[in-house]
């Protein structure tokens, strides 16, 4: 007989979660039913993964089978990254419970007219301006790049930051200047958050519209909608403080992460991402796919889902 005091682990909606936690140097495990980080002295720190959108695991972390199972049950995305979040090596997938969302995304991506409509809607939302008529996806991509470079230049001027161009090398992280390091750290935070939302909603990170051919193409598409009004100003702000000697003694990347976390919370970004994705895909002008006529319900009816549509719980 089931324990009446036992509460099944079920995902909660992305919009009700905190954003991102970076972890390093410790073992992640489940002890006494709690998700914990255990350091080399055996000190445990509890981490409420059920209330997080994403865990970023840096070098020096190990994770047990029980910890991964718990993250999967509560729908917390786990991403393995390089030191300071500079590389993405792998990601656990907490979503995948819905095929209709993925098929609708793929239908829009495969139809050239619908794809162009989606890209135009992204452009409109990103710059609050209608894109010129009769422009291809490649032309819009080029126009977008010009506008983004100008935004970077203006923000650098606003915050009095020395700025040459967006340059960084994954193999020589410390060789980059402080503004570029801050920007890379900030965008890594945004990418993790957007991927968690995409998976939670039942979409595929790899099926992009403006970006193509990358495992995170749609992540880049979605992140670009918010980048210049969220993490980019935050990165330049931190770079300016460091240049003026007003930052703390922690690495620039840590200062940026803390500032981005606070910015995500204040802006309510997690509440916006999934509804915005739905509206953008509807701009393609296609109808969502219907169930196949031969489709049948499972013999054992599934439990009423919790969380977002893509969560398995």
UniProtKB/Swiss-Prot annotation:
Mn(2+) binds at residues 144, 211, 224. The keyword Zinc-finger does not apply. Pfam families: Cas_Cas1 (PF01867). Its cofactor is Mg(2+); Mn(2+). Keywords: Antiviral defense, DNA-binding, Endonuclease, Hydrolase, Magnesium, Manganese, Metal-binding, Nuclease. It is an enzyme of class 3 (hydrolase). GO terms for molecular function: DNA binding; DNA endonuclease activity; metal ion binding. Belongs to the CRISPR-associated endonuclease Cas1 family. This is CRISPR-associated endonuclease Cas1 1. It comes from Rhodospirillum rubrum (strain ATCC 11170 / ATH 1.1.1 / DSM 467 / LMG 4362 / NCIMB 8255 / S1). The gene is cas1-1.
